[in-house]
């Protein structure tokens, strides 16, 4: 009987195909996990960082430094980084919203889109307001505010805007949780 050395390679082809499909499936599953991880990390870093800073660091700074004015000069620096983190997180949220568009229900889809749009608009506002407030602050030779009334007005707008942005962020995160909960439920089986 004639044996070809090509025969074993032909017999192994189906095994290779199934191995390739398993690898492809594993990569796809892990990409989903990576996406969820990145979204959760963005939530934790930006919204979590903002919540901790506003709820703990600022009040403690006021207590230790003796007033809002002193902590304001620290806040001026920190909020620049919060805005950078906000732009990064909002970019991640936008990608997640696009990738979730087909799999989410109409109410969740539109809530994600509306909250994202509002957060982006507010982020743009904060980025514009920040240098306007900075120009009213003098750092040398001693820390001072040039125009108290104008600064207070801008600062008040800034605080209201960040509060609305944070609230929109919480609604957005809730919608992400709804999507994750739906993904983790087993699909119903037909009898």
Name each model-derived stretch.
Residues 3, 9, 139-171:
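Alpha-helical transmembrane segments of multi-pass integral membrane proteins
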Residues 20-91, 97-100, 137-148, 152, ...:
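Interfacial loop at the N-terminal end of multi-pass membrane proteins
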Residues 1-31, 183-191:
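Transit-peptide-like, low-complexity N-terminal presequences
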């Amino acid at each position: 009987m004639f044996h070809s050395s090509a025969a074993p390679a032909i017999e192994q082809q189906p095994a290779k195909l199934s191995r390739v499909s398993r690898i492809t499936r594993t990569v796809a599953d892990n990409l989903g996990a990576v996406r969820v991880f990145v979204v959760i990390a963005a939530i934790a870093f930006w919204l979590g960082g903002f919540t901790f800073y506003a709820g703990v660091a600022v009040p403690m700074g006021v207590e230790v430094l003796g007033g809002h004015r002193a902590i304001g000069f620290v806040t001026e620096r920190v909020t620049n980084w919060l805005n950078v983190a906000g732009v990064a997180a909002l970019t991640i949220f936008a990608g997640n919203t696009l990738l979730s568009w087909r799999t989410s229900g109409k109410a969740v889809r539109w809530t994600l889109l509306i909250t994202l749009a509002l957060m982006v608009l507010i982020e743009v506002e904060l980025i514009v307001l920040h240098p306007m407030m900075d120009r009213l602050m003098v750092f040398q030779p001693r820390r001072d505010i040039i125009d108290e009334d104008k600064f207070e007005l801008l600062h008040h707008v800034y605080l209201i805007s960040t509060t609305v942005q944070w609230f929109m962020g919480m609604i957005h995160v809730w919608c992400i949780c709804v999507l994750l909960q739906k993904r983790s439920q087993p699909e119903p089986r037909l009898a």
